[in-house]
Amino acid sequence: EMDRILVASSNDKATAMLVSLLKETFPTCKTSIAATGLETRRAVGSGSYDCVVINCPLSDEYGNELAEIVCTSTDASCVAIAKSENADILADKLEDFGVMVIPKPLGRQYFYRSMKFVSAARKRMLGIRSENLKLHKKLEEIRTINRAKCSLMQYLGFTEQQAHKYLCLLYTSDAA
């Protein structure tokens, strides 16, 4: 589920519609609003969002560079909404960054399904990231153990097996 979503939109009517659709899709979600690309950059820099929805164009920029920045510098998912005649071109530019591009006019059901897909993809990505962090921690532990073994072998003349056994004894006596 999405907990915090930032809506970047310079059109008040479109902003109200997007907020309404997001509340239908994610009833418990907190929605913040930014009216310009600059406001969006500030909000993204100072807050943690699960997703940033950009209603292209914004008053101070189109929104494609903003979408790239969101995807490359934060953990947030990003959805760009663009006129149907621009959506394919925008998608070609942004999909490799992980931006979901949705064409206007916005269909309620299509928006709902797209946002649910973005949410599921984010959940999956966060699960993979968590697993990756665990593996990095495990790898660092192995490196530390190997450095300890090398020190025992170099300075105390232990064999690799003796160093391993010694470290295992230390570990089990510390755990007890």
Regions found by a protein language model. Give the residues of each.
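Conserved acidic segment of CheY-like receiver
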Residues: 2-13, 18-22, 52
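CheY-like receiver
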Residues: 122-154
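Conserved phosphotransfer microenvironments
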Residues: 15, 37-40, 50-72, 85-86
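Short hydrophobic/Thr-rich beta-strand motif most characteristic of the beta2 strand and flanking loop
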Residues: 28-36
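Alpha4 helix (beta4-alpha4-beta5 surface) of REC/receiver domains from two-component response regulators
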Residues: 64-65, 84-100
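C-terminal output helix
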Residues: 106-115
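A short, hydrophobic beta-strand element within the central beta-sheet of small alpha/beta folds
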Residues: 75-85
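Conserved small/polar residues in nucleotide/adenosyl-binding loops
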Residues: 171-176
